[in-house]
From Swiss-Prot:
Organism: Cyanidium caldarium (Red alga)
HAMAP family registered for this protein in UniProt: GTPase_MnmE
GO biological process: tRNA methylation; tRNA wobble uridine modification
Function summary: Exhibits a very high intrinsic GTPase hydrolysis rate. Involved in the addition of a carboxymethylaminomethyl (cmnm) group at the wobble position (U34) of certain tRNAs, forming tRNA-cmnm(5)s(2)U34.
Domain named TrmE-type G: residues: 221-384
Protein name: Probable tRNA modification GTPase MnmE
Residue stretches in coiled coil: none
A Pfam family the protein falls into: TrmE_N
Family that this chain belongs to: Belongs to the TRAFAC class TrmE-Era-EngA-EngB-Septin-like GTPase superfamily. TrmE GTPase family.
Length: 465
């Protein structure tokens, strides 16, 4: 699976800049670079030194580019192998030419994520850290980047490793009890240890599982849903906030039949805006499906904007939606749109009708861009109220969540079921604890991972990482 040959790739984006970087990793990387470079004799090829020189083509002895060469000898490198970086001028033509010269010296082109895969296979980082590298690269907010970097720096899975250590000791004590139960083992003592350790483990796992929703908000952004009856200006509001036409706007009710989304940054907050199908009684089957999806989707959003039409005032259709939101126990904000139409009497009637609801009301005009600053501040305000302390050691992703849920079910069944029976089957508990440890090993990467699983993880990386 793991070829110990020397690999190379361009590590920087091809879209220009000041410098292009080529990266090599493997036992022959330093010798290869020595062969294709001209470096003055007073410079030493020592680890973690920077050399100045030229890359040359040995075929015609021509010079290709002026470069800096960074040396990182094993194991003090990203891959824990000998790593060399060549910094040349930011020309994709030059970078490709240097790469061609390296390949002619017997270096292989790296596959996507192969440098990080080598770091994992050489034991420098764990599997959770591998995924944190990917999260750092693809993070869209400062908070999510910090969380991923924190996971990467701390080894990613310290809490999981502590949990695994605790349960391993428990399993060892249990197996000792099983083997020597006829001699001198105190039955009450082992049962107390089982109950105490499993209970504390359940609390730890529950805390990790609960962090998933928090981390999801960081990675996916605050979900903001715009709802209301047809033609109140939901699509226009989305377009106004997005500052571009994301959603089709017409005078015909029911134009939006599916959920339209747009992602934007408000300050340091990632926001996902959703324009939804207008909620009303409809005979059109396709529109009815869109309305049904809207009603289900509202429950997933952290912020709901309920849009009213200042021209029409509060209608019976609006009242139906208002009551539905109250029944769902959603903390929604009321937007009175089209206030530029000089309909203050209707606006006053809306305030009078809703004065007992204690809902925040914002007056806006999507067409004239009135009230949008208040709207954006409202999003930031409500989003910040859902802020939380970042998990210190570990961020749970979707795959780990499934494993942790299964582990929780196993331990919960042991705690509430097996340990409360008149006759406790210690052999069964030992088997279940081994299943738990196997699951924890999958998270830390300590268990041998199938080739296709590794390939799936590292295929998400770019070449050069």
């Amino acid at each position: 699976m793991y070829k110990r040959d020397t690999i190379a790739a361009i590590a920087t984006c091809p879209n220009g800049g000041g410098v292009s970087i080529l990266r090599l990793s493997g036992s022959k990387s330093i010798d290869v670079v020595k062969t294709v470079s001209l470096v003055s004799s007073n410079q030493c090829w020592h680890s973690h030194c920077i050399l100045y020189g030229w890359i040359k083509d040995n075929e015609d002895q021509s010079f290709v580019d002026e470069v800096l060469i960074l040396l990182m000898m094993a194991p003090r490198s990203y891959t824990a192998e000998n790593v060399v970086e060549i910094h040349c001028h930011a020309s994709i033509v030059l970078a490709n030419e240097i790469l061609r010269i390296l390949v002619k010296q017997g270096v292989r082109l790296a596959k996507p994520g192969e440098f990080t895969m080598r770091a994992f296979l050489n034991g420098r980082i764990g599997l959770s850290q591998v995924e944190s590298v990917l999260k750092v690269i693809h993070s869209k907010t400062i908070a999510s980047a910090k969380l991923a970097a924190n996971t990467l720096r701390r080894g990613g899975s310290e809490r999981i490793r502590r949990l695994k250590h605790t349960l391993s000791l428990l399993l060892a004590d249990l197996e000792f009890h099983i083997d020597f139960s006829d001699e001198f083992i105190d039955v009450d003592s082992i049962e107390d240890e089982l109950r105490s350790t499993i209970q504390s483990s359940l609390l730890d796992i529950k805390d990790l599982i609960s962090s998933y929703n928090k981390v999801s908000k960081l990675n996916e952004g605050t979900k903001v849903c715009i709802i209301g009856k047809p033609n109140v200006g939901k699509s226009s509001l989305l377009n106004a906030i997005a500052k571009r036409e994301c959603s089709i706007v017409t005078n015909f009710p029911g134009t939006t039949r599916d959920i339209v989304s747009f992602e934007t940054m408000l300050g340091n907050t990632l926001v996902r805006l959703y324009d939804t199908a207008g909620i009303r009684q409809s005979v059109d089957e396709i529109e009815k499906i869109g309305i049904s999806k809207t009603e289900l989707f509202v429950d997933e959003c952290q912020i709901v904007f309920f849009v009213l039409d200042a021209i029409q005032g509060l209608s019976s259709e609006d009242s139906v939606i208002f009551n539905k939101l109250n029944l769902m126990n959603k903390n929604f904000v009321i937007l009175i749109n089209k206030i530029d139409k000089k309909v203050q009497r209707k606006i006053d009637e809306i305030y009078e009708t809703l004065k007992c609801s204690n809902r925040r009301i914002i007056e806006v005009s999507a067409i004239k861009n009135i009230g949008l600053e208040k709207l954006n501040n409202c999003i930031l305000d409500l989003s910040s109220k859902e802020d939380f302390d970042l998990p210190v050691h570990f961020s749970v992703n979707c795959k780990y969540l499934e494993i942790l849920n299964n582990i929780y079910l196993i331990l919960d069944e042991l705690y509430t079921g097996s340990l409360n029976k008149s006759v406790t089957s210690y052999d069964f508990i030992a088997v279940e604890l081994r299943r738990v440890l196997q699951g924890l090993n999958q998270i830390t990467g300590d268990e041998v991972v199938e080739n296709n699983v590794l390939d799936a993880i590292f295929s998400k990386f770019c070449v050069g990482k």
